[in-house]
Design a protein with these regions (language model features):
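RNA pseudouridine synthases
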Residues: 1-305
C-alpha cells in the first residue's frame, strides 16, 4: 500500500498515530510504531515518532504498508448549485492572487466530513475564483460561527498562512453575546480545558483576553481575543463562568435553553497579520440576526478601535 495524503485543518495538531487510524482504519499501535521506526510512514519525507503531531497541509506518505486497509467512512461529497456558489462569492471581503477572505455564514462547515455536507471548500472548488487551482483551508472556524475566514489559492500561501496561525502571529478578535452580566469588565481568562482522545483525558491550557463592550442584567456583549486556539475555547470559557453564549446548544445551562436563538451568537469579527512587512486587516460585518439580538437585549456596539 503506497499512498500520499495532505493534512487538512480539521486534523491540525493531531498525533500521527491517531491520524493514521482515521485514514486506514483499526490498526494496532505496535504496528504503527513499527512502520514509523522503519520509515514506512513519513511526514514531509522525514521520519517521525508516534507522538509527532501533524500540521495543516503536511504531506503524509505511506510506503509499502503490509496492513490490509479497512473500510473508513467516506466524506460526503457536496455538489453546490450555481446559486449557492454565487451567494458565497457575494460574501468575499478580499480576493488577491494568494488567498481569499470572506465573511462566512453561520451553519456552513469549512470542509466536508462524514457528518457535514455543505462546506466552503467544495463550494469554492467550483468557483471561477479558484479556476486552475483549488481552495486550501488554513485555519478552523466552527460550523455555527460566522465571520472572517481565509482560504489560500496556492500550496505556498497555505503553508505560510498556516505557519502564521500556528506561531500565533495572526491576531483574531471575536464578538459574542452571552447570557447575563459579566462581573469583570476586562481582563484575561486562563483555564485548563479538558478534552478526550479516545479514553485518554487531555488537559489543555487556554488563554483569552476579554473586554465587555456593553452589558445589562440580561446579556453582555464581549470582545474576545483568543491567544491559544483550543477547540471551542471561547464557548467553553464563557460556559465555565455560568454565562454561555446565546444560541449555543452544546455548552448551555439548563435554564438558558428557554427561548434559545437559532444562531450561535459568536462572530469572527476581525483578523490581523503581517506578510512581507505589509499589514493585513480584515473585518466582517455583523450578521442581521446578531444585530437584531443586540437591539432586543438593548446592547450598544460602536465598533472596535
Amino acid at each position: 500500500m503506497n499512498k500520499s495524503y495532505t493534512v487538512d485543518s480539521t486534523c491540525n495538531d493531531m498525533r500521527i498515530d491517531r491520524w493514521t487510524r482515521l485514514k486506514i482504519g483499526k490498526i494496532p499501535q505496535g504496528l504503527i510504531e513499527k512502520y514509523l521506526r522503519s520509515g514506512k510512514i513519513k511526514i514531509n519525507k522525514k521520519k517521525i515518532k508516534s507522538s509527532t503531531k501533524v500540521k495543516t497541509n503536511d504531506i503524509v506518505n505511506f510506503f509499502n504498508l503490509d496492513f490490509k486497509e479497512t473500510i473508513v467512512q467516506k466524506k460526503i461529497k457536496f455538489e453546490p448549485s450555481k446559486e449557492i456558489i454565487k451567494s458565497n462569492e457575494d460574501q468575499i471581503i478580499d480576493n488577491n492572487e494568494n488567498f481569499v477572505v470572506l465573511n462566512k455564514s453561520s451553519g456552513i462547515s469549512v470542509q466536508g466530513g462524514t457528518k457535514s455536507k455543505k462546506n466552503l471548500v467544495d463550494i469554492f472548488a467550483k468557483s471561477e475564483i479558484f479556476q486552475g487551482t483549488k481552495p486550501y483551508s488554513v485555519h478552523r472556524l466552527d460550523k455555527d460561527t460566522s465571520g472572517v475566514f481565509i482560504m489560500s489559492k496556492t500550496r505556498e500561501s497555505a503553508q505560510l498562512l498556516t505557519s502564521l496561525f500556528r506561531l500565533r502571529k495572526v491576531h483574531k478578535t471575536y464578538l459574542a453575546i452571552c447570557h447575563g452580566e459579566l462581573n469583570t469588565d476586562e481582563g484575561e481568562w486562563n483555564d485548563d480545558l479538558i478534552r478526550y482522545d479516545g479514553d485518554k483525558k487531555i488537559i489543555e491550557k487556554a488563554k483569552t483576553i476579554f473586554k465587555v463592550l456593553d452589558k445589562n442584567s440580561e446579556a453582555s456583549l464581549v470582545e474576545l481575543k483568543p491567544i491559544t486556539g483550543r477547540k471551542h475555547q471561547l464557548r467553553k470559557q464563557l460556559y465555565a463562568l455560568g454565562q454561555p453564549i446565546f444560541g449555543d446548544i452544546k455548552y448551555k445551562l439548563s435554564n438558558s435553553s428557554r427561548g434559545l436563538n437559532k444562531n450561535l451568537m459568536l462572530h469572527s469579527y476581525q483578523i490581523k497579520f503581517i506578510i512581507d512587512d505589509v499589514k493585513h486587516t480584515y473585518t466582517a460585518l455583523l450578521p442581521d440576526y446578531f444585530r437584531k439580538l443586540l437591539k432586543t437585549k438593548r446592547l450598544r456596539f460602536s465598533g472596535l478601535k
